[in-house]
Structure formats: structure tokens, C-alpha cells
Amino acid sequence: MAKKGKNYLEAAKQVDATKAYTVEEAIDLVKKVDFAKFDASLEVAYRLNVDPKQADQQIRGAVVLPNGTGKTQRVIVFAQGEQAKQAEAAGADVVGAEDLVEKIQGGWLDFDVAVATPPMMAQVGRLGRVLGPKGLMPNPKTGTVTMDVTKAVNDIKAGQVAYRVDKAGIVHAPIGKVSFDAAKLVENFKAMQDVIIKARPASAKGQYITSLSVSSTFGPGVKVDVASF
């Protein structure tokens, strides 16, 4: 494990590691102990009682946070014809088809989210080895494979967050910036919480959310009481 820096250790002293805080208390504490010299993201980490190896327990989706993420997302869209025009009108940063596929094959990756229409997926599929490991591959579950490119671009620009359970059964997701008003962060948290709960697989047994913490980008995690979830 990497050695923690002095600032981290000082921040960690202010967090009671034996206590599970309310969401409101946890967010206030994360804001208080954040030591970054930039506007850090505030992130949640859910540990879920699921087996990601099972197809029906691979939790994945997207949610539009009511107060956004505080980050401007660069969106590209793979589309042709009318959908390409709609994507441009909606404010997509780059729109293309085969030319865009070739551009990415050439090493260009200056974007945060990729959207594709279903007819384009045969070509976009060639980028799987490039986009897949980076979490940039369009996927129907996150609303990024769709004919309604206008809605997709609007949602992403408005603060949509994609989430996915990892191999350890943990979902990491940003819910805003530390500079956000605490009440807005709580609203964003509740929006994320709702979709995580609704995504519970029917086959999941026992307590679904086994632990939950919030933290800033480099700050210590603050445990949240999950007894009511």
C-alpha cells in the first residue's frame, strides 16, 4: 500500500473510523477535511452484496444528477445523416462516422463520453480494445447506444454519471464537487442512491448495500450508516 502523505493523515485524524455517519454529516465532514489545492470531486463508494461474475448481477447504468457534476463533459457521437445533424445541434463536441473511428484508431482520445447510434455499432465495435479498458465504449445500459442522440447528449451535458460495479462488487461514482453547497450534494447523493437501490438484482441475497463511504478525490473515506438502506 502506498504511504499516505502528511495532509491525508491530518485529515484522517478528524474522521472517526469507528463511526457510521448520516449522509449529511459525512458530506459536511468530507468538505471540512478536504485539503486539495483544486476543486476536488466528491465521490461515493458502494460495496454491494452481489457477484459481478453472474450476468444478472452486473450492475451498470447512468443517472442524471439534479445539480450536475461540476465538470464539463466532452461528448463525441458516432452517427450519420439526420442523427448526425441532431447530435451537432444538441452540442456534441465531435460528430462523425467512419472518419471518427479512424481518428480514434490513430490515437486520438480527447473526449469523456462516446455515444453511438445502433447502426454505427458494427464500425464502433472495432474500437473495443481501445475504448473498452478505458470505460469509453458506448453501451445501451448507460443510454449511450441510442437513436435519440439529442437526449443522450443533453443528459450527459446536464450531468449524467455512468456507474458500474467492479470485480470486487464496488460501485464508485462522482456526485459533484467539494465546492458545491452541501444541500446540493445531498440531493445528488439521493439521486444516485435511488438508482443503486432500484438496480438491486432479484437474485441478490441478504443485505444489498454492505458498506458505503464518501470522500474527496484524495481525502479519507467517511463511512455512512447503511442501516436504513
Swiss-Prot record:
InterPro entries for the chain: Ribosom_uL1_bac-type, Ribosomal_uL1, Ribosomal_uL1-like, Ribosomal_uL1/biogenesis, Ribosomal_uL1_3-a/b-sand, Ribosomal_uL1_CS
HAMAP family, per the entry: Ribosomal_uL1_B
GO cellular component, one term: large ribosomal subunit
Segments passing through the bilayer: none
Protein name (Swiss-Prot/TrEMBL): Large ribosomal subunit protein uL1
Stretches of the chain forming a coiled coil according to its record: none
Protein family membership: Belongs to the universal ribosomal protein uL1 family.
Classification lineage: Bacteria, Bacillati, Bacillota, Bacilli, Lactobacillales
Gene of this entry: rplA
Task performed by this protein: Binds directly to 23S rRNA. The L1 stalk is quite mobile in the ribosome, and is involved in E site tRNA release.
Originating species: Latilactobacillus sakei subsp. sakei (strain 23K)
A biological process from GO: regulation of translation
Gene Ontology MF, one: rRNA binding
